[in-house]
């Protein structure tokens, strides 16, 4: 079922208002905010990998408040059970029947905090819900609310007591992002203002759930010309055939890359994709989907996979 498209300028005004609203709380991180909004519009999910205390939870709260959507947070720990995520069936003595008590996954925006601290069984319960948009309970299929966005946070792999997500589950995330520390000027403003709490408390919604669903429907109408599709596919194909890569980008990864480029174009007020969209999203969308034969870490914050993607993008000719 398709929705009636909104007027073009109206569509872009709504998305711009959303970005501006979130940036009232998350300062100096415009690109991260843009990528998160693009993931939402593309019906994807986000893995935020960063050290504690840089604003991952605040970002999730700011998005939920800006969109007037329901929000839940799950703290993933080693003793978390799948039922703690999806819910549990209990016996109602008054009604003399079994009834399902829904878990926190039944929400619009879910913050899965420190997902790599839970066991693989609990991780899988969430990732199944992410991929299907439904929960299976007692031979029934229960749909999750729409829109549905998971922001999963993950501490860097070198932290003790974690269960790294396998490649097949990492592939479920549209983007893997890092917020990073703010620059000196923005951090000084944050100190002067007493933190982001007050700004978050006073944040008013700028979009309703139905408006978000309408925007999601319109993403597929964003145009990408044939030369750009070929450019995108050249990047994807190189990850599969390059001698340094043990595992390349899947077909699902290529599809989500295409959709993310359309969504980012919308976030930037365009009804067409440009080469810069494809280049900007290559790292966030593709780097967590590949495995390098040589996993030795390089100096700095860039992983071997990120460096590999950067090199591919720099070497493949950009269409004119």
Language model region names:
Residues 2-5, 9, 241-320:
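C-terminal engagement/docking regions of AAA+ P-loop ATPases
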Residues 9-54:
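Pre-Walker A (pre-P-loop) alpha-helix and adjacent loop at the N terminus of AAA/AAA+ ATPase modules
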Residues 34-38, 91-111, 140:
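Conserved alpha-helical scaffold flanking the Walker A/P-loop in AAA+ ATPase domains
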Residues 40-77:
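Walker A/P-loop
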Residues 50, 113-114, 125:
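Walker B catalytic acidic pair
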Residues 51, 85, 153:
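P-loop (Walker A) phosphate-binding loop of NTP-binding proteins
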Residues 66-94:
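AAA+/P-loop NTPase substrate/partner-engagement loops
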Residues 92-97, 118, 122, 130-207, ...:
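Canonical AAA+ ATPase core
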